Amino acid sequence: MTRILAWHFLPEDRRLRYDDGREVKAGESLSVDVTPVLCERGMHASPRIIDALSFRTGPVLCRVRVSGDVVRGGDKVAGRTRECLWMVDAAPALRMFAVDCRARQIATYRRRGVRIDPRADAAIAAAYGYLAGTVTLAEVRAAADATHAAAAA
């Protein structure tokens, strides 16, 4: 039997979508009695975590094992059964990843000679500060507003 180790995101309530509603629990398996078809039916997941981000329905990250008539696609798999090995609220990590991505994007533009308004750096610094607990949400919003104003000018 094919068993694929993969990643899957859940909403905060940790329940399946699409009128199923079953709660996902670490250490337990959930199954469906259908022939898996990618993007249509079955228990889906992504072998690479970066791909799982594209299908994210919420902040709860699960390490899963998919089995049972497994169908493979480029960025996902589907099977009859998905076993949740463990789960974690990944919201803080997802926020940090988003800020890191934006900071890397700005650095890439600078290396290519694009002039970046300093208010963009202030917004990134404010976002990092917010994640560290040293900056308020109001301060982050003010920095973001300044960046948007600079872009519009």
Per-range role (PLM):
Residues 1-153:
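Short, glycine-biased loop/turn motifs at secondary-structure junctions and
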